[in-house]
Each structure stands twice: as structure tokens, then as C-alpha cells.
Amino acid sequence: MLVEAQVTINGSKSAIWAAITDIENAAETISGIEKIELVERPATGLVGLKWRETRMLFGKPATVEKWITDAAENEFYKTRAESDGFVFLSTTSISESSGGITLSSSHDSKPQGIVARLLSIPMGFLFKGVAKKALLQDLNDIKSAVEQE
């Protein structure tokens, strides 16, 4: 199930990059995140950064361990997480055009195994709208933080 969202931000690419890569303090910027726990910090760069992220999901805390798999400064980073028979892949990217600077995020959940595949059918219909709403809220929270600086 692929979910995508984007917002246009009145700010510089470097300011947006600083906001989206401040993983350690993401709970202060993004209202949907309850808690961040850093697990592993690479010697340099972002690739290999690993953390546990706790969000409220249907009224209950849900924690998933994420890590950055690829990144290009001021352009994008990709993350991976694995939980309950699913692999979650996301890309957060910054692009510039005549219309301004756009922050985009895409999240793809891939079921692993027959049970997860069967669960993904009914959950896809229910969860896609919830996921898109949460993703857009995350992007708008980042937009607010960058535009207030």
C-alpha cells in the first residue's frame, strides 16, 4: 500500500533539511510522534541512523524501529522499518521549482508472508486514509516549524 503526500514550504532547502533530519528532536516538531529513542548513530552522515519511534495508533502506543538506508543532503532520505510481518519503506524528499520548495513523503507497506498478505487486503482500505491524514499532518507540522524560524 503506497501513501503519498506533499506540501509547499516557504523556507530554504537547508532549513527544511535541518528540520527533517533532526530525528532526535522530531517529537517536539511532529505532533503525531510521542517519543523518539536513538538506537544507533553513524560516525558520519545519516545512513545507518537507527531509532525507535512511538506514535499513538487507534488509541494505543505503537513503537517501531526505523533506520535510514540512503540519503543525499538537502535532497532526500529513505528509511526502512519491519513490524508484524510488514516491511515499511519511506522516502522524504525536498524539491525546488518555480512554485517554491516542496516537501514530499511516500510510505509503502509491503506484506511479508501469507498471513500479512491476507491481513493487508482489509487493512489497506481502512488504513490508507488514516495513514495519508497522518502523513500530511507530519508534513504540515514540519512546514509550521520551518516557516516560524
Please describe what each predicted stretch is.
Residues 6, 67, 89-93:
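Short, surface-exposed charged micro-motifs
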Residues 1-46:
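Hydrophobic ligand-binding cavity/cleft-lining segments
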Residues 14-17, 136, 140:
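Amphipathic alpha-helical segments that line or abut small-molecule/effector binding pockets
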Residues 82-136, 144:
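Beta-strand/loop substructures that line and gate deep hydrophobic ligand-binding cavities in soluble
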Residues 37-86, 97, 102, 137-149:
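Glycine-rich portal/gate segments that line the openings of hydrophobic small-molecule binding cavities
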Residues 9, 55, 107-109:
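Hydrophobic beta-strand positions in extracellular immunoglobulin-like domains
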